[in-house]
Amino acid sequence: MIGKSLLTFSTLNEGILLKRYKRFLADVELDTGHIVTAHCANTGPMTGVLKPGGRVRVRYAPSPSRKLSWSWEQAQVVNQAGNRIWVGVNTALPNKIVRLAIEAGCFREALGEIARIRNEVKYGRTGNSRIDLLLTPGENNCDQRQIFLEIKNTTWTDGSLALFPDTVTERGQKHLQEMIDVLPNARALLVPCISRNDVDLFAPGDAADPIYGNLFRQALSEGVEVMPCCFGFFSDHITWEGMRPFRETQTIFPLP
């Protein structure tokens, strides 16, 4: 299944990133010479992929319900091996492509048959949190527990090592604790969605958020499962690039 196309779309427009500002906005000079303002769904630091002057891909999708007609979808980076890689930066996509991967059978070996998938289901101690995906096993699945699946868009790398998070994330810390809470009556599955196809391994971003790293290791010891998965980003489609192994700690290095 490696290289299987999961999502196709109209060819994206390419250009140069001029700047990102006010967290949600990015000015892009298209290859046509026109300058447009695109919506940036990723409000974090985008460590290693936010590079003014770098090439980007944007989507034109005008709608009466949207203030901006353009969306920033991908960024091109040069990795430590000197290769140019396209990285998915639209944080609205990971939930969609992970669900598509499950439906395509990419997780079947790890999860067994899945009968039902629900999005954004309320859970947690207060009932105010929402799990990204709630999976119901098929009747032939040997483990009939529901699967609470939390997805994390992962774009930061150190060489071939993918890292999440790239900044302090109290929300991410809370999610780990809530995943521990659903055990043992259900399965809890953390899926780092690695939105680039040039990595071999995943680890928690201890340098960016040591509390998250500690909670990650606690979650592992309590029984939370971790399944990093990798995707390839192209101008008109996204591909499944397989699972990746993980390690429990990051070699500490300073953030750029």
Swiss-Prot record:
Protein name, per record: Sugar fermentation stimulation protein homolog
GO molecular function: DNA binding
Family statement: Belongs to the SfsA family.
Species: Prochlorococcus marinus (strain MIT 9211)
Pfam families for the chain: SfsA (PF03749), SfsA_N (PF17746)
Stored InterPro entries: SfsA, SfsA_C, SfsA_N
Domain of life: Bacteria
